[in-house]
């Protein structure tokens, strides 16, 4: 088996998806069913689910007292019933769920003001007997990194601030979550959403150990989502260098890079770093939508990132929710369909991405990307038409060439081409295409 990819029910599986919210489990049953059925019909099999409850209308995990404060020792059944429903409905549809335990953004600004974990909002602790404050300002950003004091919620561990009281309730929450997830075999675990570089990596390592202890020998697959887009940055060493702690690498922030070649190189760097002990590289978010903020990029950025990730050897790729992503929009659905069409004919599980673009001649920046099962199959992605030469000089035999029109999810008629040559590949038109060459047996 290729350990850069997931196995599910004994078979290798490529995970692609899109969804319209961060915390799908919070939706009512009708809306949830509609979303999951739409995803499945598009060939999607992967969703993200943050356990956050910081948006308007979200239900909280804890019971409320008469005075409106929360009691962290009592559960709100509605929250956990909704979570259980998501687990059941995704399992029935063979959709893999990547669950995020902790939500960084719930500890800042307005979200923290409303949070049950805020000392003013519960009956279980105060600012006197814990390290937690009533308010935390959001981080500041400059020169591609983040500044500002960390929130104490992520510093409760014995080796950090040793805030045992808050940690007791955090462990109760994690135990309850795992009571729901551990009976299922289609769950991936991510510790935190976008933990920033000013937070010590011990937080993620601690909860990875905690999940493994609770799992008591059952297989679990765990990662941490670091905020820094550049995978060569020190923050990512905490994951890349620790295969015994994290079972896969979360590469979501790669799509925050807007230079297409940098986006490709970043993913190939992660693959190179993991090559001696391969692990799946997941993208639970792919940013970009015309509707979104400028930092996220536009529609075109999103779909190009999706295809570069696919050709580049990603194990999972999901369109982020609107407005900063395409979610499960009509455009996203078209691209999911096309990805599935390609995966039906091209063997991603045996393929090696052309990290340095060797084998492609006459290539301009962001013109074409190659992955191949050497001497057998070649897939070349063209983000916007163009032409390159594919080096088949040392490769004998004849090949079937087909073009996938990505925007329309359909194939052109097959043609026969010969090896032992530099083969010119000219995209049939502008727009996004994949050329697939398969050796004729």
Predicted regions and their residues:
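Active-site mouth of glycoside hydrolases
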Residues: 2-245, 257-258
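Conserved beta-strand positions
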Residues: 49, 191-192, 251, 283, ...
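Flexible loop residues that form catalytic
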Residues: 52, 194, 254, 286, ...
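Hydrophobic/aromatic ligand-binding patch that stacks against planar heteroaromatic rings
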Residues: 89, 273, 308
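Active-site clefts of carbohydrate-active enzymes
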Residues: 197, 248-257, 264-300
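Short beta->alpha connector loops
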Residues: 226-232, 254-256, 287-288, 383-387
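Glycine-enriched alpha-helix->loop->beta-strand junction motifs that scaffold or abut catalytic
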Residues: 241-249, 276-280, 312-316
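Aromatic- and carboxylate-lined catalytic core of secreted/periplasmic carbohydrate-active enzymes
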Residues: 279-281, 288-292, 298-415, 424-441
